[in-house]
């Protein structure tokens, strides 16, 4: 009975002992991140690195509106299709927008040679000057410049022709050889366009140009071609059996271009002095224009984000995040979020970094919870918390800065005869995209793993700091907690927290209390040993008595014969 009383007193004393615990912050966050080793780890704080939203609108890019081609495409705009007259005043733009089903291109049927390369060149042009390269009235005095019209390029119900080209025909049954030149004095590249007409019959050739064996020659420092009309009847397109092929070249500053022909020349009328801007580009989109401003435009809509990655569209104009195929890129900045189970007791699961964090500690990431005669409370360790915040903030900013190389990414242009090259290009682009995506995801996984390990290390360091101060003045009771062998008031608790705990001051009291507890343990151990021996002997006697009674009963009823020999 005495032993039982001592054990009970020991337990009550332990329950009233002053206690300090080391733990970490927890909250109601549902943010999850992935690491190299784990998926969907719930954390207290994290930052998103992946933009996945847009406004669905076409916007001004840094205050400059785009050039919307509407129902026209690049060819119709540059050649001057009469249906594209509204685009003639265009001089500058932030980017160019085509619709997927633009119907007004080259109105007279034929091939636009190297059209995809021209589109590629225009993707870096932000403005141009449209000027008369060969004035209509004075450049071709011996040729007709007004009869070259066609129903294929009608306007307002009447036959017409391109606004930037002249269809030269014979004048008074004569088409003398022409030769005209232009010297580029604009100080910038000049885009020059022209065409060659291929009649459907010799009769048409003679009707238009008089000469049967016609040619067209175009020469500059970087361009030299001679064209011969191909006379043949072809299937009707836009009610035309003839064809026109369209050509272009870029004339460098100071260079000269010379046109020579005795028939079939579709001569330049207007040309374009180009000004390049690396932020421009061409996108194909059905989105509508709105009164909004952005730094990044995609075919699906504008992105207003400073994040380093986006998964909206690979084609972008302006200062845009890098496109990746990832569905989630979230970087942890806080800790594992494992709130303690309150019902298990204040100094059970709640009190340590092993089983859970503290929702009650809101002013820091790591800290202490104490309990003594004066009460209980939380206190954050501001120094370790601030050092961790600074380190993680610098790391996140560094990652975003290194990966946040914002740029324009436009699609490459291929014609119908370059399908193999286009397919190869797609494979190469897909390969680069896969590498970018893999690098981004791996970077986030590794950094998340390092951050969570960093937090675990900080909590462990805080625990070891307390342990090294208390030494044998307290005992570890698990879950990050220490139970003092002495009374520890609030001043004492503060000294433990700030690293000024006076071990010698409390060592004598701790020694006495420790010896009392150890003595109770030893005495109770002796009693338990006596009880164990007594229990064993008593059990054996009961077993022997039971066995004797059974044997006597069996002998008395004849079930067991007993013989005693002397």
Swiss-Prot record:
Keyword Transferase (UniProt): no
Gene Ontology molecular function: any one: host cell surface receptor binding
Record lipid sites (S-palmitoyl cysteine): 555, 562, 565
Keywords, comma-separated and alphabetical: Clathrin- and caveolin-independent endocytosis of virus by host, Clathrin-mediated endocytosis of virus by host, Disulfide bond, Fusion of virus membrane with host endosomal membrane, Fusion of virus membrane with host membrane, Glycoprotein, Hemagglutinin, Host cell membrane, Host membrane, Host-virus interaction, Lipoprotein, Membrane, Palmitate, Signal, Transmembrane, Transmembrane helix, Viral attachment to host cell, Viral envelope protein, Viral penetration into host cytoplasm, Virion, Virus endocytosis by host, Virus entry into host cell
Alphabetized Gene3D superfamilies for the sequence: 3.90.20.10, 3.90.209.20, Hemagglutinin Chain A, Domain 2
Residue spans, topological domain Extracellular: 18-529
Broad class of where this protein is predominantly found: virion
UniProt PTM: Palmitoylated. In natural infection, inactive HA is matured into HA1 and HA2 outside the cell by one or more trypsin-like, arginine-specific endoprotease secreted by the bronchial epithelial cells. One identified protease that may be involved in this process is secreted in lungs by club cells.
SUPFAM superfamilies recorded: Influenza hemagglutinin (stalk), Viral protein domain
Disulfide bond residue pairs: 21-481, 59-292, 72-84, 107-153, 296-320, 488-492
Keyword Lipid metabolism: no
Membrane topology: Single-pass type I membrane protein
GO terms for biological process, alphabetical: clathrin-dependent endocytosis of virus by host cell; fusion of virus membrane with host endosome membrane; fusion of virus membrane with host plasma membrane; viral budding from plasma membrane; virion attachment to host cell
Cytoplasmic side: 551-566
Signal peptide, first to last residue: 1-17
Sites marked Cleavage: 344-345
Subcellular location: Virion membrane; Host apical cell membrane
Glycan attachment sites: 27-28, 40, 144, 286, 304, 498
One Gene Ontology CC term in the entry: viral envelope
InterPro entries (UniProt xref): Capsid_hemagglutn, Hemagglutn_HA1_a/b_dom_sf, Hemagglutn_influenz_A, Hemagglutn_influenz_A/B
Function: Binds to sialic acid-containing receptors on the cell surface, bringing about the attachment of the virus particle to the cell. This attachment induces virion internalization either through clathrin-dependent endocytosis or through clathrin- and caveolin-independent pathway. Plays a major role in the determination of host range restriction and virulence. Class I viral fusion protein. Responsible for penetration of the virus into the cell cytoplasm by mediating the fusion of the membrane of the endocytosed virus particle with the endosomal membrane.
Remarks, miscellaneous: Major glycoprotein, comprises over 80% of the envelope proteins present in virus particle.
UniProt family annotation: Belongs to the influenza viruses hemagglutinin family.
Subunit structure: Homotrimer of disulfide-linked HA1-HA2. Interacts with human CACNA1C.
Protein's recorded name: Hemagglutinin
Species assigned in the record: Influenza A virus (strain A/USA:Phila/1935 H1N1)
Lineage, uppermost ranks: Viruses, Riboviria, Orthornavirae, Negarnaviricota, Polyploviricotina
Gene it is expressed from: HA
């Amino acid at each position: 009975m005495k032993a039982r009383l001592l054990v009970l007193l020991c337990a009550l004393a332990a329950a009233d002992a002053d206690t300090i615990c080391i733990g970490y912050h927890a909250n109601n966050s549902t943010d999850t991140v992935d690491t190299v080793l784990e998926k969907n780890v719930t954390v207290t704080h994290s930052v998103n690195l992946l933009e996945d939203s847009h406004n669905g609108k076409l916007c001004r890019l840094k205050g400059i509106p785009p050039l919307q081609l509407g129902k026209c495409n690049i060819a119709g705009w540059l050649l001057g299709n009469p249906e594209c007259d509204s685009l003639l005043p265009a001089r500058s733009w932030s980017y160019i927008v085509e619709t997927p089903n633009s119907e007004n291109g080259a109105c007279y049927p034929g091939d636009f040679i190297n059209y995809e390369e021209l589109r590629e060149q225009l993707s870096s042009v932000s403005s141009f000057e449209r000027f008369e390269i060969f004035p209509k009235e004075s450049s071709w005095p011996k040729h007709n410049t007004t009869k070259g019209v066609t129903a294929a390029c009608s306007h307002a119900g009447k036959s017409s022709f391109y606004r930037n080209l002249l269809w030269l025909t014979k004048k008074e049954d004569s088409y003398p050889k022409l030769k005209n030149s232009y010297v580029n004095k604009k100080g910038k590249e000049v885009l020059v366009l022209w065409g060659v007409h291929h009649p459907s019959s010799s009769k048409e050739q003679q009707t238009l140009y008089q000469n049967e064996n016609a040619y067209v020659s175009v020469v500059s420092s970087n361009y030299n071609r001679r064209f011969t009309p191909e006379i043949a009847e072809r299937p009707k397109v836009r009610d035309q059996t003839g064809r026109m092929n369209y050509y272009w070249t870029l004339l460098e500053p100071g260079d000269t271009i010379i046109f020579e022909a005795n028939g079939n020349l579709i001569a330049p009328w207007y040309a374009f002095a180009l000004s390049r801007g690396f932020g421009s580009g061409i996108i194909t989109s059905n989105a509508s224009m709105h009164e909004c401003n952005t730094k990044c435009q995609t075919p699906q809509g504008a992105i207003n984000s400073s994040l380093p990655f986006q998964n909206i569209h690979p084609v972008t104009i302006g200062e845009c995040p890098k496109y990746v195929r990832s569905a989630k890129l979230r970087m942890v900045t806080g800790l594992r979020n494992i709130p303690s189970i309150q019902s298990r007791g204040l100094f059970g699961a709640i009190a340590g970094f092993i089983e859970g964090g503290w929702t009650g500690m809101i002013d820091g990431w790591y800290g202490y919870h104490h309990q003594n005669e004066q009460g209980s409370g939380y206190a954050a360790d501001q120094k370790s918390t601030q050092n961790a915040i600074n380190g993680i903030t610098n790391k996140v900013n560094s990652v975003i800065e290194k990966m946040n190389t914002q740029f324009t990414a436009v699609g490459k242009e291929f014609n119908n005869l370059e399908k193999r090259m286009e397919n190869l290009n797609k494979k190469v682009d897909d390969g680069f995209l896969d590498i970018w995506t893999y690098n981004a995801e791996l970077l986030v996984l590794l950094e998340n793993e390092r951050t969570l390990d960093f937090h675990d290390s900080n909590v462990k360091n805080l625990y070891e700091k307390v342990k090294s101060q208390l030494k044998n003045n307290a005992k570890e009771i698990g879950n990050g907690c220490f139970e003092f062998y002495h009374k520890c008031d609030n001043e004492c608790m503060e000294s433990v927290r700030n690293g000024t705990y006076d071990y010698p001051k409390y060592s004598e009291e701790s020694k006495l209390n420790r010896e009392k507890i150890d003595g109770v343990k030893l005495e109770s151990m002796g009693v338990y040993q006596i009880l164990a021996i007594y229990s064993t002997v008593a059990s054996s006697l009961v077993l022997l008595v039971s066995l004797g009674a059974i044997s006597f009963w069996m002998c008395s009823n004849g079930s067991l014969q007993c013989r005693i020999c002397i």
